Amino acid sequence: KDTYDYYMVGYELGKTVTDHGSVARGICVTDGKGHLTGIDERTRVEKYPGGIHFTEDGEHWVDVPADTTVSMNLWGYTPGFLKELEARFPAFLDKALAENPIKGEFFLPLAVSQLIGEKKATVTVLTSPDKWYGVTYAADKPAVVAALRRMTDEGKYPDGLWK
C-alpha cells in the first residue's frame, strides 16, 4: 500500500487552554468527511478577555474560534510512521541547528502535514467533546487534581488508578 491511514483525537480549542499563560496547539483543518487536511503548530496560544488568539511574533495576534479543532498529540500511527520520521529528521536537524539549536523541536504534526500534502497519508479525526486536563503551569495543578478526583468519584476512573 502506498498510503498510510492514521487517526487523531481532536478537541475543541476552548476546552484545552489554560487561564495561566500560553500553550502550544496544533490548529487543525478538516474536510467534510472528517479527515485532516492541514495542521499548523502554534506555540503561543492564549486566552484573553475577548476569546482565544495566537501570535508568532508577540506583536500581531490572530483570533481563533473556541470551537476550532486542535490536536493534543493523541495519534494512531502504523509502524511505517517511524520510518517516515527517520527519513525526515536529518533535514529538520540541519535547519534547527542553523536557526535555533536550543529550542528546535521536531513536531509530529509537521511530519503528518507533510505526508498529507504529499498524498501519502490520510488522517481520520476522532472528535472528543471532553475537556482536556493538563498541567502546563503550576497554577493549573489544583484544577486538574480536582477534576481527576471528581471523575474518580463519578466512576470514570477506578479509585486507586495511581497505586
Which residue ranges define each predicted feature?
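Catalytic, metal-anchored helix/loop core of enzyme active sites in primary metabolism
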Residues: 149-161
